[in-house]
Amino acid sequence: MSVVGLDVGSQSCYIAVARAGGIETIANEFSDRCTPSVISFGSKNRTIGVAAKNQQITHANNTVSNFKRFHGRAFNDPFIQKEKENLSYDLVPLKNGGVGIKVMYMGEEHLFSVEQITAMLLTKLKETAENSLKKPVTDCVISVPSFFTDAERRSVLDAAQIVGLNCLRLMNDMTAVALNYGIYKQDLPSLDEKPRIVVFVDMGHSAFQVSACAFNKGKLKVLGTAFDPFLGGKNFDEKLVEHFCAEFKTKYKLDAKSKIRALLRLYQECEKLKKLMSSNSTDLPLNIECFMNDKDVSGKMNRSQFEELCAELLQKIEVPLYSLLEQTHLKVEDVSAVEIVGGATRIPAVKERIAKFFGKDISTTLNADEAVARGCALQCAILSPAFKVREFSVTDAVPFPISLIWNHDSEDTEGVHEVFSRNHAAPFSKVLTFLRRGPFELEAFYSDPQGVPYPEAKIGRFVVQNVSAQKDGEKSRVKVKVRVNTHGIFTISTASMVEKVPTEENEMSSEADMECLNQRPPENPDTDKNVQQDNSEAGTQPQVQTDAQQTSQSPPSPELTSEENKIPDADKANEKKVDQPPEAKKPKIKVVNVELPIEANLVWQLGKDLLNMYIETEGKMIMQDKLEKERNDAKNAVEEYVYEFRDKLCGPYEKFICEQDHQNFLRLLTETEDWLYEEGEDQAKQAYVDKLEELMKIGTPVKVRFQEAEERPKMFEELGQRLQHYAKIAADFRNKDEKYNHIDESEMKKVEKSVNEVMEWMNNVMNAQAKESLDQDPVVRAQEIKTKIKELNNTCEPVVTQPKPKIESPKLERTPNGPNIDKKEEDLEDKNNFGAEPPHQNGECYPNEKNSVNMDLD
C-alpha cells in the first residue's frame, strides 16, 4: 500500500513517500526533487515537469503554468480576468462557465478545464512516485492553501479523481508544516501542561500564509490562520520585471511587453537575480543576449535598491501577522518559536520583517521547500493501516465562518444560524433539528464574504426531501447532520425524520431495536478525532436545536447520543410503561428514524458524466504519451546504434570484420543516419524496430567476435589452472602422498580420466582456433569453456576434497595431583569440611554454591 504526500504548488511540486526508514522526498527522472508545475502540448504528445519548463519560451502559447489558483472559479471572476493579461496561453469560457485553457495538441485545437490540467500534473507526480516505490500508487494526501474555499477544494478532489488517485485528505499547507514540525519533537509539554505555541510563516510563489499552533505531547491543534492570497515571490519578480522593462524601453528603445517570449526570458532572469541578491548585497548584473531585434541588453541591481523597489510589498507582510494575533487572542510573548518555510522567505527583507514583528530570532529547522510534502506524507502514513506511526492527533481549523439559512414552515420569514465559526475545530459534525410538515431547503454560505478571497459567498443549496407531517397532523422532527469533513469541505451528510408509529400490545420489539433497523451508516464516515460538545447555540431559533457529539475514533453514526434523549415527555412516559401491565388497552408508540434523501446543488462540482468524460480523455492522452515515448525510444536506439558502431568499426571492431563487409557496413550506417534525419524523421515505431534489426544482423556477429576474443583467453587460462591443479593431485596420489592415501584408487582413476579428456579437448580447440582469422566466427565460445570448467569441477572436486577418516584416540584417565586417597576417606573429609572454604585444585576455584552471595557488578 502506497503512502505518498503531494505538495502541488503554483510554481513547483514535491513528492514525499513513507518508507521503512522514515519520510523521504523523491527525485524525478532528472534527479531533481523539484518538479515544475508546467505542462507543454506538442503535435505528438504532452511534456510535463522539467522537460515542459525547458521549452516554455520556445512553445509559449502551448505551455501552461501558474494555473493552481484557477480551481473552482468562473471565467468572469475578477481574479481570472486580471491574471489573464499576464499569461502566455489563452483562457476561454467553458460551457459550464468555468475557465477553459486553449492549446494546440496533436495538430488540433483543444479546450481543457483546470481540473484536467491539474490531473495531467498529478499524472506525472504519480508516475514519478511509482517509479521510485516500484509499485502502484493510489492513496495519497494532497496539500491545498488554507484559504481555499469549498468550491476550490472540490475542484482539486475532482482533479485527483480524474487521474485515479484516492485522496485520503486535502491537507492545509500550514497544518502539514505543523505536523512535520511537531511529530518529531520529544520535548513537548504533557497534556495537562500549558501547550507550546508556535507560529508558522509560509511565503511561497503566489501566496503568504501564517498559522498559530498549540503543541502538547502527541497532539497538535491549529488555533488560527491568516493569509494574503496575493502576496508571494511572484509579486517580487513582477517588481523587478516592471523596473527592467522601463529601463530597457528608455535605454534600448525596446518594449519587452510587446513580445511574450522576451517577457518570459526577462521573468526567468529576474527570478535568478532575486535569488542571487538573497546572498549578495553588492551590485549584480543582468545580461540577456539577443533579447529583442537581435539586441543584447544589460542592467544591474543591488539588494538595497531591490528592497526600496518592493517597499510596498514588504509592508503587507505585517497585516496577516496582526490578524493572526487578533483572532487567536495571543500576545507576542506567548509565542515560543517562529518557524518559516517557503521559497520567498529566503529574501532577507522578508525575514527581517517577520523577526522584527515577533521580537525574536526566526527558526529555520524545517526544509523550506519540502516541509509541506513531508507533512502530507506523515498524514498519509497516519491514515494508512500499512504503517505504524507514533500516535499524534491533528485538529485543524475552519478558515471561514459558515452559516445556514432556511425558510420557516408556512411563513415568509427566514432563519439564519452560524453553524461553524471562524477557526472552529475541524473535522467536526453537528446535528440540527427542524420541525417541518414537508420538504425544505437549507442554503449554506460564508458568513463573512469580505474575508473570503472568492467572489461567491454561497456554498450550496441542500433540499431535504420526503418530509411529511405526523399522522396526528403535528410537525415532524427532522434531524440534519452538518459536517466539515477532513478535506475542509462543508456537507450535509445525513437527514432523518423521527416518526411515531402506533403498535399492537403484543408487539414486544423495543424502540432501540427499531432504530437500529432503520439506521444506516453515513455516506462518508470520516473519523472525528477532535470533536467537542457545543450546545451554546441551542435555542437561538424557535425551530432549531444544535447538538454536537463527543465522538471517538470510530465513524460517527447518523443519530447522535445527545439528541436521542430529547423525546417529548409524553413519549418518555410511554417508554417507561412498556414493561408494566397497562390499566387499559392503549396503543403503544414506537419511534422510528426514517432516512431522508438529500439533493445537493453545489456552487462548484463536476457532474458524473463530465467527470467520466475527463477520465476517459486523460486515459487516452496517457496512452498516447506512452506510445510516443516508445516510438522515440526506438528511434533513439537506431541513432545510438549507428553512432556506436561507426566509432568502433574504426577502432576495436576493425580486426573482426573483413574489408569488404567493413566498407559495406559503414555505407549502410551512413545511409541509415541520412534516413533518420530525412524521411525517417517521423515514422512509426515498427519502422525503427525493423531498421535496427537490419543493422544488428551485420553488427551483432562482429560484436560477438570481439567479445569472444576478449573472454576466450581468460576462460582458457582458468581451465588450464584447474587441469594443472587436478593433475598435480593425481601425481601426488601415485607417489603415495599421505594427504591422499585415503582416496580409493578407482575414484582417482576417474579424476585422471577426466583431466586427460578435458586436456585433449582444450588442445584440439585451441589449435583449431589458432588457424582461424579474427574476422571469422570462433570455433569455440567462452561459454563452452565455462561449461567444461564446471563439468571438470563436478567430477574431480568431490573426490580430491574427501576428508580423511577420524582415528579415535584411547581415553586417558585423569589423575589428580598429590597422593591417592580412598573414596570413603574423601567422602568423610567432605562431610567434616561442610561450610568451609572451597578447595583449590590445579589453580581453579570451585565456589560453594550454598554460601554464594549474589552481587551487583559495576
UniProtKB/Swiss-Prot annotation:
Residues 563-584, 805-814, 821-832 have a biased composition (Basic and acidic residues). This is Heat shock protein 105 kDa. The modification N-acetylserine is found at S2. It is found in: Cytoplasm. Interacts with HSPA8/HSC70. Interacts with HSPA1A (via NBD) and HSPA1B (via NBD). SUPFAM superfamilies: Actin-like ATPase domain (SSF53067), Heat shock protein 70kD (HSP70), C-terminal subdomain (SSF100934), Heat shock protein 70kD (HSP70), peptide-binding domain (SSF100920). InterPro entries: ATPase_NBD, Heat_shock_70_CS, HSP70_C_sf, HSP70_peptide-bd_sf, Hsp_70_fam, HSPH1_NBD. Keywords: Acetylation, ATP-binding, Cytoplasm, Nucleotide-binding, Phosphoprotein, Stress response. One of its GO terms (molecular function) is ATP binding. It comes from the Eukaryota.
